[in-house]
């Protein structure tokens, strides 16, 4: 295994079971090793020993399915037993929202370090569930941009309806799908799709600044936040997801290249057994994009890191990241200029 001395985020994979079957899901078909029933007490004892041996601390812990609500009892137990020891400021659960219960909401609201990300999957969440989700103290909504939904504006009316149901305006963000083998090609983005997407983002930016539209302001805020976040870390490592700064494990201690694929072919080792040899050879070329001369010489590399190593549409991804950076830099410059001018005017008004 690689040196783990600089791990920061921790991904824990509980299984791949899900109550939905979305065509754009990144999990690939097969019978993942992660789905075997693990002994929680055994996992906790071995994980505590791992922390003691390595003196590891993690900046964040992410709990993954499948659909995490199908594993909620196990997730809750693991959280309670590891949270005091891992040093994480945030524990994040990403769910499709359809199975959230009052017990889940009440539990999360008792712990300020638990953050819930609710994935919007084409209106499958009922109004009653949205009202319940709205009672969470810490959550956001995320949706995907894909071939069948090329503009955030296509969800604007849904978002406003959800806000009315909740009586609040949660943060909302949009990510482009990753066109790996798990995602059906019907959802893969084309260059024309991206042109339409960025045209809509320009319109959203204008509506956010001129009309002060709250939905558009939220979309732009997340767009810029994600760009700045990517800029901080993607270009300094060999792959955006696979590196010595992220640990992805299942309840047996198996380590994975990334949390988006928990198939046996993606197992790289085991934190409980350093001598463990993966049962199947790794079938992914982790650096097929990120280590190429074209990627490393590209001015966009610091914010994309070469893109996803599982992508089947690398050229489209490249076009996305380059255009995103062009717009983000322009909008950030305008924002900084506005802040400087506003600060200057305030100072002038304070002078005698």
Question: Which residues are covered by each model-predicted region?
Answer:
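Flexible mid-to-C-terminal extensions adjoining Fe-S/redox cofactors in radical SAM and related proteins
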Residues: 254, 260-352
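Residues that scaffold the ATP/ADP-binding catalytic core of kinase and kinase-like folds
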Residues: 25, 103, 307
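Cysteine-centered iron-sulfur cluster-binding motifs in ferredoxin-type domains/subunits
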Residues: 14-21, 67, 295-302
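A C-terminal junction/extension of Radical SAM enzymes
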Residues: 171, 180-264, 303, 352
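Radical SAM/AdoMet-radical enzyme domain recognition
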Residues: 11, 40-64, 71-192
């Amino acid at each position: 295994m690689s040196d783990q001395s600089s791990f920061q985020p921790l991904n824990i994979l509980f299984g791949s079971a899900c109550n939905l079957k979305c065509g754009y899901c990144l999990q690939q078909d097969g019978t993942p090793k992660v789905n075997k029933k693990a002994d929680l007490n055994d996992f906790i004892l071995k994980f505590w020993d791992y922390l003691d041996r390595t003196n590891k601390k993690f900046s964040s812990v992410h709990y993954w399915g499948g659909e995490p609500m199908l594993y909620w009892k196990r997730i809750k137990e693991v959280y309670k037993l590891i949270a005091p020891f891992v040093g994480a400021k945030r524990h994040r659960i990403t769910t499709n929202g359809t199975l959230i219960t009052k017990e889940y909401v009440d539990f999360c609201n008792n712990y300020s370090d638990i953050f819930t990300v609710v994935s919007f999957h084409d209106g499958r969440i009922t109004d009653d569930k949205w009202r319940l989700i709205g009672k969470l103290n810490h959550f956001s909504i995320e949706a995907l941009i894909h071939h069948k939904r090329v503009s955030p504006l296509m969800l604007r009316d849904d978002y406003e309806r959800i806000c009315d149901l909740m009586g609040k305006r949660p943060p909302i963000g949009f990510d482009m799908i990753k066109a790996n083998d798990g995602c059906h090609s019907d959802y893969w983005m084309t260059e024309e799709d991206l042109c339409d997407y960025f045209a809509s983002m320009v319109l959203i930016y204008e509506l956010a600044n001129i009309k002060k539209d709250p939905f558009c302001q939220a979309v732009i805020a997340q767009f810029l936040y994600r760009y700045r976040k990517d800029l901080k870390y993607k270009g300094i490592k060999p792959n955006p997801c696979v590196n010595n700064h992220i640990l992805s494990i299942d309840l047996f201690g198996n380590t994975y290249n990334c949390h988006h694929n928990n198939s046996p072919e993606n197992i790289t080792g085991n934190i409980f057994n350093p001598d463990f040899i993966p049962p199947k050879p790794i079938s992914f070329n982790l650096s097929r994009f990120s280590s190429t001369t074209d990627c490393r010489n590209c001015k966009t590399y610091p914010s994309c890191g070469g893109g996803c190593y599982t992508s089947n549409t690398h050229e489209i991804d490249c076009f996305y990241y380059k255009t995103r950076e062009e717009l983000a830099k322009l909008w950030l410059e305008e924002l900084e200029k506005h802040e400087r001018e506003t600060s200057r005017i305030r100072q002038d008004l304070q002078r005698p």
